[in-house]
Amino acid sequence: MGRRGVTKKRNRIDRVKTRVVVLGSTGSIGTQALEVMADNPERFELVGISAHGSKPDVLAQQVRDFGLDLGRVAVASEHTAEWLDGEFGAHCIRGKDSARELVEAVGPELGECDVILNALVGSLGLDATLATLGTKAKLALANKESLVAGGQLVLKAADEGQLIPVDSEHSAMAQCLRSGRVDEVDSLVLTASGGPFRGYTRAQLEDVTPLQAANHPTWSMGQMNTLNSATMVNKGLELIEASLLFGIPAEKIDVTVHPQSIVHSMVTFIDGATIAQASPPSMKLPISLALGWPDRIADAQPKLDFTEATDWHFEPLDDEVFPAVILARQAVTAGGTMPAVYNAANEEAAVEFLNGRLSFPRIVDTVAATMEACQHLSAEPNDLEDVLAAEREARAKAHERMATWLSD
């Protein structure tokens, strides 16, 4: 017997499985999350999923692989829901509010769920985020747009430690911030790969195509996130999210271009020390950390190999060619629902670009013009309807501005 009665079995830890619901299960983050859970069956149990329904075969295979009860599967598409019912001889949750309805059906007070991963795309994820926080389940948040749009509304709904970031940058910051107190932070540094158009001029960007924008140099992501990375709007959204999550003013959050995407974020403290989190570019590490927080999951992804010669390069972001980050700082400073305006305008402009009707630089031009037209929307929202109203106005203003360019 060892000291204090500890035997040779001291490394054994009896764990209760963490029960997880994944919203957006057929997307890039969702599918990787399911892979993490499949690789760690002793740690995680999948109890529910939601999806839009645009990939019915993938969705059906997930149901089979994890032996899910169809009553814990939510599908936005009525057509896919009917097909799924026929495949399994049961009834799934369906309709545009199905993700929220799933969340409300499996909260921890009902004894079914511990963690809900919100991997939905766009500000449509806000409703599910607020519903999750209401259940008191841990929220693993990959849907950055819901925090950007909801702002203080989301933060006020969250209990201490309830909201865990999944974005690689914010996961990295959360890890780095363990090295000191928030009042000891001098600045946060977000890293950006630079996207497929790093080094381009504004004139060169005029002719880029949606196919070119989809070719990210280091990350494999969904269509919208890949486009946002190309415009640097993704980095603007991450700046807003970091300011909200960690309580750091926007002017103390910097962005640097790091093409290798190995250093995911850094925190500089008041004594001059800079703490960085580095790992190969893979979302499985931040996903596994969010699902298991605060514990780490062994072998979540390959480790860096320092026996090989490696160069890590950093350079400043060209704000004149890529002004999205400057606009994001302005949105944080304006406050209220201005971050929601920023996001909504981008969502509308991105669709026009992807459909071949708007040039690439006009995406961020639309965001700037919409923010200018919506300066009065700087009051803090009282409820979800205030956010939705601001988004509706922003989307309308964005289309008014784009119409002048589309008619040229």
From Swiss-Prot:
This protein's record includes keyword Oxidoreductase: yes
Enzyme Commission (EC) number: 1.1.1.267
Residues binding 1-deoxy-D-xylulose 5-phosphate, per UniProt: K144, S168, E169, S193, H216, S229, N234, K235, E238
Pfam families (UniProt xref): DXP_redisom_C, DXP_reductoisom, DXPR_C
Protein name (Swiss-Prot/TrEMBL): 1-deoxy-D-xylulose 5-phosphate reductoisomerase
Family: Belongs to the DXR family.
Binding site for Mn(2+): D167, E169, E238
Gene, per the UniProt record: dxr
